[in-house]
From Swiss-Prot:
Native species: Cupriavidus metallidurans (strain ATCC 43123 / DSM 2839 / NBRC 102507 / CH34) (Ralstonia metallidurans)
Cell compartments where the protein resides: Cytoplasm
CDD domains hit by this protein: AdoMet_MTases
HAMAP family xref list: Methyltr_PrmA (MF_00735)
Catalysed reactions, semicolon-separated: L-lysyl-[protein] + 3 S-adenosyl-L-methionine = N(6),N(6),N(6)-trimethyl-L-lysyl-[protein] + 3 S-adenosyl-L-homocysteine + 3 H(+)
Family recorded in the similarity comment: Belongs to the methyltransferase superfamily. PrmA family.
Record protein name field: Ribosomal protein L11 methyltransferase
EC number: 2.1.1.-
Top-level taxonomic group: Bacteria
Length: 304
């Protein structure tokens, strides 16, 4: 059985209504994407730590509806526009989707990934290429972080090169938990992961258990205001700038901060946001993304 995808670009405030209308009119699935994804205009959706996102769609949103081959998408789009009192009917594009063994296709897109010198991220349906390496068994799922994105790889490379045995670690915006898990496998001590998304917290706990790693994962409001030897945050530049004071305060004096999710052109402004507390510099770049690192100045010696 073949399928059809109908793609409509709409304004932010219409995204949820169009999604509901298309689904009610027979779409098999509906997703909303950033129409500016992978461009300089790409927008993150985020809220302050512990709060819900303030926006549910992007300024330019793309609604993608899937239909079976017997449905006429033109009639559905027209009916949805009428139901929403939208005139004229917005332009849309159609593209065919051939039926396939979707499980096998998905699995074929995720091969083991080597990161740094000795780290391998291995999906559960593959054997580890090097059993003596640092192996992370991780499948694509609900939360960001499988090692395929340059920002994740950069953070993992930094950890491999710099983590010290027994250091305490905070992974802020932990996603899948991959950075917390690799830190533990590289010898870190007590490790905590924080995310504002409950699904990410659940995914991190599951992945830690699968990898036989002891680490704690929780929502921000459930974690004490402790300081750590290492704080790593792989998010995006705007939330990193907003959280500069908070993240800097979670680094103990003499501890280190690692930031990624930052484009090369954004590195200077992110570093400037942290300058009052921690001097940050670019450690390494990859495919236009950077990893920044810095050390919090040690507390002045007591001269009394």
């Amino acid at each position: 059985m073949a399928f059809q995808e109908c793609v409509i670009e709409i304004a932010q405030e219409q995204a949820e209504a169009w999604s509901d209308a298309l689904f009610d009119l027979g779409a098999l699935s509906v997703s909303v994407e950033d129409a500016d994804a992978d461009t300089p205009d790409e927008q993150p959706l985020f809220g302050e730590p512990g709060l819900e996102p303030t926006r549910l769609a992007w300024n330019r949103s793309r609604v993608v509806a899937l239909f079976d081959e017997e449905t006429d998408p033109a009639l559905v789009v027209t009916a949805a526009a009428n139901a929403l009192k939208v005139d004229p009917v917005p332009p849309y594009a159609l593209r065919g989707v051939e039926d396939q063994d979707w499980v096998r296709l998905t699995q074929s897109q995720f091969e083991p990934i080597r990161i740094g010198e000795k780290i391998w991220v291995v999906p559960s349906w593959h054997d580890a290429p090097d059993p003596d390496a640092v192996i992370l068994e991780l499948d694509p799922g609900l939360a960001f972080g499988t090692g395929s994105h340059p920002t994740t790889r950069l953070c993992m490379q930094w950890l491999e090169a710099n983590v010290r045995a027994g250091e305490t670690v905070l992974d802020y915006g932990c996603g899948s938990g991959i950075l917390a898990i690799v830190a533990k496998k590289l010898g870190a001590g007590d490790t905590v992961g924080i995310d504002i998304d409950p699904n990410a917290v659940d995914a991190s706990r599951y992945n830690a258990e699968r990898n036989r790693v002891e680490a704690s994962f929780a929502l921000p409001e459930s974690v004490s205001e402790a300081t750590y030897d290492l704080v790593v945050a792989n998010i995006l530049s705007n939330p990193l700038k907003l959280m500069a004071a908070m993240l800097s305060a979670r680094v103990r004096p003499g501890g280190r901060l690692i930031l990624s999710g930052v484009l090369e052109r954004q590195a200077e402004e992110v570093a400037a946001a942290y300058a009052p507390w921690i001097p940050m510099s670019v450690w390494r770049s990859e495919e236009g993304w950077v990893c920044l690192h810095g050390t919090r100045p040690a507390a002045p010696a007591d001269r009394s």
